[in-house]
């Protein structure tokens, strides 16, 4: 497959996504697969909106129709549309509400201003403190000392 074909497909995909309020954040083609596989990651142009499964499904139809209607590809292909996914880092209030009970790693400064890390299950964040459950005990970390909070796997 020529570089020109890949470039034309990428441009067509980006144009189709833009027409429906999305940006393409990643575009990959796997030409060694049969049929050819095209993977496209998208995000909303409006940063306050999250990409839903319905968004991916609808955009997949539009992009598929655009490719089929063009003369760029003359072979079968699979098209996969997905989002960038969520960040591992919790920053917004809604993140802390959504992931209550999930395992997190907290980086913070102790009383001597030395960076520390601890793990536990997220309980809540208030205006004053972050609370995590560590083996049944609540650890309270002042919000002003928290450097970052990151989702982890249960094993850490």
UniProtKB/Swiss-Prot annotation:
A GO biological process held by the record: translation
Keyword annotations: Cytoplasm, Ribosome biogenesis
Localisation: Cytoplasm
A GO cellular-component term linked to this record: cytosol
Function: Required for maturation of 30S ribosomal subunits.
Family to which the UniProt record says this protein belongs: Belongs to the RimP family.
Name assigned to this protein: Ribosome maturation factor RimP
């Amino acid at each position: 497959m020529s570089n020109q074909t890949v470039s034309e497909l990428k441009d067509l995909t980006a144009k189709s996504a833009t027409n429906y309020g999305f940006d393409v954040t990643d575009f990959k083609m796997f030409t060694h697969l049969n049929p050819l596989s095209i993977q496209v990651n998208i995000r909303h142009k409006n940063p306050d909106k999250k990409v839903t499964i319905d968004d991916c499904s609808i955009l997949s139809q539009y992009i598929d129709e655009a490719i089929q209607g063009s003369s760029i590809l003359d072979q079968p292909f699979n098209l996969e549309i997905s989002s960038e996914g969520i960040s591992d880092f919790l920053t917004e209030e809604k993140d802390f509400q959504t992931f209550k009970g999930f395992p997190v790693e907290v980086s913070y400064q102790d009383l001597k201003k030395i960076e520390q890390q601890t793990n536990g299950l997220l309980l809540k964040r208030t205006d004053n403190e972050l609370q995590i459950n560590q083996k049944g005990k609540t650890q309270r970390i002042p919000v002003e000392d928290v450097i970052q909070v990151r989702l982890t796997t249960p094993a850490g």
